[in-house]
Curated annotation (Swiss-Prot):
NCBIfam families: PRK10883.1 (NF008135), TAT_signal_seq (TIGR01409). Disruption phenotype: Cells lacking this gene are sensitive to oxidative stress and DNA damage at high temperature. They also exhibit filamentation. CDD domains: CuRO_1_CueO_FtsP (cd04232), CuRO_2_CueO_FtsP (cd13867), CuRO_3_CueO_FtsP (cd13890). The gene is ftsP. It is found in: Periplasm. The lineage of its organism: Bacteria, Pseudomonadati, Pseudomonadota, Gammaproteobacteria, Enterobacterales. Residues 68-164 form the Plastocyanin-like domain. GO terms for cellular component: cell division site; outer membrane-bounded periplasmic space. This is Cell division protein FtsP.
């Protein structure tokens, strides 16, 4: 439906004379404390219980919406595990439809990744034991149910997963969860006038909403001590990419990507965050000034009025998070570390090259996902060169592997993209150097897929078999 001149004039009169604004626009102007998901840590001999169930959540002050979540909460607890642990998870499905779950970025064999072969019917459980052998990184877990991933993630089946190791423990960076080390889960939604999320699958492409949410609320703030603050950023949106920056122009110090620390911090004025991508940043709050992270220009009054009549993809507010320093500056403060890893990240020699094509229509290399077809067969312990092309800009993810970006449209990747990754934004062509460190099997393959969740549900998924080392 298009907005006619008559409707615009009528709505303008209503809005200006009566002060009427949509609930989401009103809520965007009210800052709320940042909700910090509870921390669930692995302990030897004790399983981690993850119950997938209905929940209630307040996306806007004074409202309460029926949603999905983990352990009775919209989004789930933050899981923290340690390298060397063998972590037993017990997933329980208390919904009325099938669900499968995965931990994106986890380096484990195919049978432990989730997917169609690990589908949980209503009232069923799945209890994998996950060997944690990878380096410190910020990962995320989410639903990956065939043909239902977009809806289920949108409903709330997602959360952050942290891997720690001796390096992350010893570095002079913030590590007190919920004090100076915060999860920041960014999503966009469309809320009705009662604060309830609306989801209508688009006819093409992926869903984009007009309401920015961080950890489930609009326009949050958090009080922090003066000094360094660590933010673990996750884009859990269905398809929207964000360009993050500080409102006062100070730099974002990037210390980590999808699969762990960069060799050294990288200071940037603007930072891209694609769907499914994770980054860690440090923010210097020692000067005592309040600062906000934003992601572009917010909707104008015309756009907001238009939102009365038709769905909008323009964000009402682009405020991600406000940091409010409190207290005095400590007598001793750590400086930004010069190095995060003792050596540079090295790459091996690829044994073969592949072309991966993501089109405007669903499918990869012209084929829709088929659970009975293996699309790529590789060998554990080897490297390959993948050239990924996309007609429509979108994020691309590979399960069970790590890769390095070698070039983007023929140019070197940005410094913040030169670490180990598993998700990349493709706008044109990117060349990846992929390392296959984990095995998979025909009945338990890895996925490689469009991270536009609706495109994946429509068939933009391939299946990867990695033959184990003999």
């Amino acid at each position: 439906m298009s907005l006619s001149r008559r409707q615009f004039i009528q709505a303008s009169g209503i809005a200006l004379c009566a002060g009427a604004v949509p609930l989401k626009a009103s809520a965007a102007g009210q800052q709320q404390p940042l909700p910090v998901p509870p921390l669930l840590e692995s302990r030897r001999g004790q399983p981690l219980f993850m119950t997938v169930q209905r929940a209630h959540w307040s996306f806007t002050p004074g409202t309460r919406a029926s949603v999905w979540g983990i352990n009775g909460r919209y989004l789930g607890p933050t899981i923290r595990v340690w390298k060397g642990d063998d972590v037993k998870l017990i997933y329980s499905n208390r919904l009325t439809e099938n669900v499968s779950m995965t931990v994106a970025g986890l380096q484990v064999p195919g049978p432990l990744m989730g997917g169609p072969a690990r589908m949980m019917s209503p009232n069923a459980d799945w209890a994998p034991v996950l060997p944690i052998r990878q380096n410190a990184a910020t990962l995320w877990y989410h639903a990956n149910t065939p043909n239902r991933t977009a809806q289920q993630v949108y409903n709330g089946l997602a959360g952050m997963w942290l891997v720690e190791d001796e390096v992350s423990k010893s570095l002079p960076i913030p590590n007190h969860y919920g004090v100076d080390d915060f999860p920041v889960i960014i999503q966009d939604k469309r809320l009705d006038n009662f604060g309830t999320p609306e989801y209508n699958e688009p006819g093409s492409g992926g869903f984009v909403g007009d309401t920015l949410l961080v950890n489930g609320v609009q326009s949050p703030y958090v009080e922090v001590s003066r000094g360094w603050v660590r933010l673990r950023l996750l884009n859990a949106s269905n398809s929207r990419r964000y360009q993050l920056q500080m409102n006062d122009g100070r730099p974002l110090h990037v210390i980590s990507g999808d699969q762990g620390f960069l060799p050294a911090p990288v200071s940037v004025k603007q930072l891209s965050l694609a769907p499914g991508e994770r980054r860690e940043i440090l923010v210097d709050m020692s000067n005592g000034d309040e600062v906000s992270i934003t992601c572009g220009e917010a909707a104008s009054i015309v756009d907001r009025i238009r939102g009365f009549f038709e769905p909008s993809s323009i964000l009402v507010s682009t405020l991600v998070l406000t940091l409010r320093p409190t207290g005095l500056l400590p007598l001793v403060t750590d400086s930004l570390p010069m190095r995060l890893l003792p050596t540079e990240i090295m790459a091996g020699s690829p044994i073969r090259s592949r072309d991966i094509s993501l089109g405007d229509d669903p499918g990869i290399n012209g084929q829709l996902w088929d659970v009975n077809r293996i699309d790529v067969t590789a060998q554990q312990g080897t490297w390959e060169r993948w050239t990924v092309r996309a007609d429509e800009p979108q994020a691309f993810h590979i399960e069970g592997v790590m890769f390095q970006i070698r070039n983007v449209n023929g140019a070197m990747p940005f410094p913040e993209d030169r670490g180990w990754k598993d998700t990349v934004w493709v706008d044109g062509q990117v060349e990846l150097l992929v390392y296959f460190g984990q095995p998979s099997w025909a009945h338990f393959p890895f996925y490689f897929n469009s991270q536009t969740l609706e495109m994946a549900d429509r068939g933009s998924i391939g299946q990867l078999l990695v033959n184990p080392v003999p």
